[in-house]
């Protein structure tokens, strides 16, 4: 009984991941969200995020931060 419940949960997780990946592929998202890698040349951060020069990933844009 426990094994079949785990298989059902695992199947639902796989279905969710597959649909999420298909959605990302169709939208063609060209900007990065929180902690997405950014370089400033080919990859950019979405609105509300800035590319951290130290870590090279997108961080929250704060007032007063350059």
Swiss-Prot record:
Annotated InterPro entries: Huwentoxin-1 (IPR011696), Huwentoxin_CS1 (IPR013140)
UniProt keyword Signal present: yes
Domain of life of the native organism: Eukaryota
Major site of localization recorded for this protein: secreted
Any GO molecular function: ion channel inhibitor activity
Tissue expression from the record: Expressed by the venom gland.
Similarity annotation: Belongs to the neurotoxin 10 (Hwtx-1) family. 46 (Jztx-7/10/12) subfamily.
Domain statement: The presence of a 'disulfide through disulfide knot' structurally defines this protein as a knottin.
Protein name as it appears in the record: U1-theraphotoxin-Cg1b
């Amino acid at each position: 009984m426990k094994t079949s419940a785990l298989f059902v949960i695992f199947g639902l997780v796989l279905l969710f991941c597959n649909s999420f990946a298909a959605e990302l592929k169709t939208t063609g998202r060209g900007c990065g969200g929180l902690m997405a890698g950014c370089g400033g040349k080919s990859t950019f951060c979405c609105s509300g995020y800035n590319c951290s020069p130290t870590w090279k990933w997108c961080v929250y844009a704060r007032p007063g931060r350059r």
